[in-house]
Amino acid sequence: MSATINPVVDNSVFTDCEVADLSLADWGRKEIAIAETEMPGLMALREQYAGKKPLAGARIAGSLHMTIQTAVLIETLVALGAEVRWASCNIFSTQDHAAAAIAARDIPVFAYKGESLKEYWDYAHQIFEWTSDGSHAANMILDDGGDATLLLILGSRAERDPSVIANPSNEEEQVLFASIRSRLTSHPGWYSRNLAGIRGVTEETTTGVHRLYEMEKKGELPFPAINVNDSVTKSKFDNLYGCRESLVDGIKRATDVMIAGKIAVICGYGDVGKGCAQSLRGLGATVWITEIDPICALQAAMEGYRVVTMDDACDKADIFVTATGNLRVITHDHMLKMKNQAIVCNIGHFDSEIDIASVQKYQWENIKPQVDHVIFPTGRRIIVLAQGRLVNLGCATGHPSFVMSSSFTNQVLAQMELWQNGKDYQKKVYVLPKQLDEMVARLHLGKLGVKLTELTDEQAHYLNLDKNGPYKPEMYRY
């Protein structure tokens, strides 16, 4: 896709981007302006730090859903002194007007809604292509799901041992491995050179964090990482309250289905599953939960949900939502047994939770973008949303701005910390200190009209606390 600048900015031409339509930039800019009023954390960081430029010299390779809210994050990073190159971390999650607005500010972005897998991995390479002669390269990664980090690490391993990309296990790996092989031929040593320049990564989501901890455990983590996901002001807000609003938004935009009276199955009762269950119950659905963890299963039961297995539920429920981060949670056999017109969707990061590959052999009927009928030989149909990828971003616009402000404020603080103090960190996975977590929360209270009670000196002494926090021990679970 070619890119020519819309005359919104200086009538100049900016070609270091791949977006759907730069004429959408004005629309994107108007929505960004609205989002900024709902993102007090990011705006406070701009006000506090823009004059100090704490990210000056940072060249951030960003791989995160290219939404309106992400545009506010990108422009905050730039305001704090960083250079940025950006791609989306999902082929369906880009909001094209958001990407256009960022490109119109001469910020390199490579993303459009409905990318092919080949384009997705091409764009993942592009965020590391700082200069054609290699004189500058990315020195920080901001990741969501871990694909940008994976690309450099796997590519570097393949430089030493090509057999690591010899046997793909699925379609996505086929495309990724082919992309790496092509780069190994055209640019020998490209991956290891880029990897060597990275100071650290900040990771947004549960799935990507899991990858980082696995690498740390094996001694394969090449640089320090900050686990943004497990900041309380991310996981207990974005994952819970964000999904509570965006799941139903995606299902309703896609299908116009009446939720009330339906049986809905949520696979997984972590923070994401809890938010999904609340939203569906709030609209009148009977909600069932599947779980492997006895603690989460007990929580679900104590909240009044029925805890079942997919084998029990697959032929009875009307709506199925996966929220586990696992693979093949909904199998071919489960889908064969589902009711006619059952709705099947996923809100976990990757598309592995529903075994979509196993039903590709049947007839597919596209209803509209990201909404498909799978027609079985019996004539029964199920409705698959976003091809098993993130339903809230594929079929809607993701989480609301306010809750993303909380998550993204953590991201900016994590980038600042690693950029300024990365040499003090070992090649391990870290979380931000609780004092910063509480600061992020404080930045968002005023928007909601919240007034905090302040401890008296006597009370603080009694509790053995600093009056200004932190207020809870590290192990406190909220």
UniProtKB/Swiss-Prot annotation:
It is found in: Cytoplasm. Its EC number is 3.13.2.1. Binds 1 NAD(+) per subunit. It catalyses: S-adenosyl-L-homocysteine + H2O = L-homocysteine + adenosine. Substrate binds at T67, D144, E204, K234, D238. The keyword Cytoplasm applies. GO terms for molecular function: adenosylhomocysteinase activity. NCBIfam families: ahcY, PRK05476.2-3. Pathway: Amino-acid biosynthesis; L-homocysteine biosynthesis; L-homocysteine from S-adenosyl-L-homocysteine: step 1/1. SMART domains: AdoHcyase (SM00996), AdoHcyase_NAD (SM00997). NAD(+) binds at residues 205-207, 239, 268-273, 291, 326, 347-349, 392. Its cofactor is NAD(+). It comes from the Bacteria. One of its GO terms (cellular component) is cytosol. May play a key role in the regulation of the intracellular concentration of adenosylhomocysteine. It is an enzyme of class 3 (hydrolase). Pfam families: AdoHcyase, AdoHcyase_NAD. This is Adenosylhomocysteinase. One of its GO terms (biological process) is one-carbon metabolic process. PROSITE patterns: ADOHCYASE_1, ADOHCYASE_2. Belongs to the adenosylhomocysteinase family. Keywords: Cytoplasm, Hydrolase, NAD, One-carbon metabolism.
